UniProtKB/Swiss-Prot annotation:
Gene assigned in the entry: rpsN
Oligomer and partners: Part of the 30S ribosomal subunit. Contacts proteins S3 and S10.
Protein's organism: Chelativorans sp. (strain BNC1)
One of the Pfam families matching this protein, by short name: Ribosomal_S14
Similarity comment text for this entry: Belongs to the universal ribosomal protein uS14 family.
Designated name of the protein: Small ribosomal subunit protein uS14
Amino acid sequence: MAKTSAVEKNNRRRKMADRYANKRAALKAIVMDQGKPMEERFKAQLQLAALPRNSSKTRIRNRCEVTGRPRAFYRKLKMSRIALRELGSQGLIPGLVKSSW
């Protein structure tokens, strides 16, 4: 199990990223628009830099929904390989069958 504080920190980052997503996208669009004057683009860049660091999506870490483990994460299932193996062997994941040949 991961530390509860690490999982909570990641959850706070997710909420903050959702809260600032529209504002961040609008500022990035202004910064990338070559048709805008340089002063306006620079001002938008400064506003973007003034936003909280944790409002960026790149600060979010993919973590297992079951254990909170940050590594060996399957995006499609939102869980780690260890949790996948345990739940799969218990038959709790539909369609997952232990292979044998």
